[in-house]
Amino acid sequence: MAVPKRKTSPSRRGMRRSHDALSAEAFHECSNCGELKRPHMLCNACGHYNGREVIAVGL
């Protein structure tokens, strides 16, 4: 079984964990309806992407 030879210092532990933080998800306002949507994604509320209707949403 692998066992550490030396105790890991707090500095080294922190450097290892420096990439583990979670970032907040990005949201942008839809240019057509104003709903919040993920960037580079189709708007779920109105079906528009990049200024044009991609899918018909609603009735």
Swiss-Prot record:
InterPro entries for the chain: Ribosomal_bL32 (IPR002677), Ribosomal_bL32_bact (IPR044957), Ribosomal_zn-bd (IPR011332)
GO molecular function, one term: structural constituent of ribosome
GO cellular component, as recorded: large ribosomal subunit
Annotated spans, Disordered: 1-20
Record's keyword terms, sorted: Ribonucleoprotein, Ribosomal protein
Signal peptide positions (record): none
Compositionally biased residues, Basic residues: 1-16
BP GO annotations: translation
Matching SUPFAM superfamilies: Zn-binding ribosomal proteins
UniProt record similarity statement: Belongs to the bacterial ribosomal protein bL32 family.
HAMAP family in alphabetical order: Ribosomal_bL32 (MF_00340)
NCBIfam families attached to this UniProt entry: rpmF_bact (TIGR01031)
Protein name: Large ribosomal subunit protein bL32
Organism, scientific name: Novosphingobium aromaticivorans (strain ATCC 700278 / DSM 12444 / CCUG 56034 / CIP 105152 / NBRC 16084 / F199)
Gene that encodes it: rpmF
